[in-house]
Swiss-Prot record:
Signal sequence region: none
Residues that bear N-acetylglycine: G2
Protein name (database record): Cytochrome c
Recorded GO MF terms: electron transfer activity; heme binding; metal ion binding
Superkingdom: Eukaryota
Length: 105
């Protein structure tokens, strides 16, 4: 498991332009991530997803996020997420630790 505080920095630098994590937070270019863990792809209420995201059918957890965050367009071809991914394993682990904590509060 990664470091939550380091993960928060990764989120602010690489994710917060398009995503929020607060419960009942607003969608931006990307969906609000509250309740992310245990939810299927393409299921955040009120966000308009691509068919690729809606039909992927995987459940978000530490393992699926770890693979997805390395290369989102490879994991879900057709996603509208324009982020290239995080190649460093440590950064991904830190980000996932932060997301696990912040999206369940």
């Amino acid at each position: 498991m990664g470091d939550v505080e380091k993960g928060k920095k990764v989120f602010v630098q690489k994710c917060s332009q398009c995503h929020t994590v607060e419960k009942a937070g607003k969608h931006k270019t990307g969906p609000n991530l509250s309740g992310l863990f245990g939810r299927k792809t393409g299921q955040a209420p009120g966000f308009s997803y691509t068919d690729a995201n809606k039909s992927k059918g995987i459940v978000w957890n530490q393992e699926t996020l770890f693979v997805y965050l390395e290369n989102p367009k490879k994991y879900i071809p057709g996603t509208k997420m324009i982020f290239a991914g995080i190649k460093k394993e440590g950064e991904r682990k830190d980000l996932i630790a932060y997301l696990k904590k912040s999206t369940s509060e």
